[in-house]
């Protein structure tokens, strides 16, 4: 149980970082709720987890990710050998924040952070 595992971090963790693990994603709201109770900030790897309860995420823009993926698929569909299509690294990262979730987790986001971030609460 993800919520129970989150509660076991009480006094043992200053922050929780989540990736796109299937167990965490399927129970994200329960984990975020437990983190709120404990005032442990949740930092995620994707925008949608911020919408679901994380304080912030520094991740790739899904549109850009899809565009790069589409370019790779296009090359394969045009008879380029899969073995010659090199993996791509996404270097342009976007900061997503939720002041609402930050407050619930005991975090104050500075004006400087808010200035440079996409506030998912505004969307």
PLM feature spans:
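Short hydrophobic alpha-helices and adjacent helix-cap/hinge residues
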Residues: 1-123
């Amino acid at each position: 149980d993800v919520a129970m595992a989150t509660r076991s971090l009480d006094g043992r963790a200053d922050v929780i970082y989540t990736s796109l693990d299937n167990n965490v994603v399927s129970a994200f709201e329960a984990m975020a709720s437990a983190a709120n109770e404990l005032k442990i900030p949740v930092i995620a790897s994707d925008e949608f987890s911020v919408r679901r309860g994380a304080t912030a995420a520094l991740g790739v823009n899904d549109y850009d990710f899809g565009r790069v993926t589409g370019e790779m698929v296009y090359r394969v569909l045009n008879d380029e050998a899969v073995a010659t299509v090199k993996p791509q690294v996404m270097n342009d990262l976007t900061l997503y924040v939720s002041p609402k979730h930050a407050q619930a987790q005991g975090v104050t986001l500075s004006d400087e952070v808010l200035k440079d971030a996409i506030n998912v609460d505004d969307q």
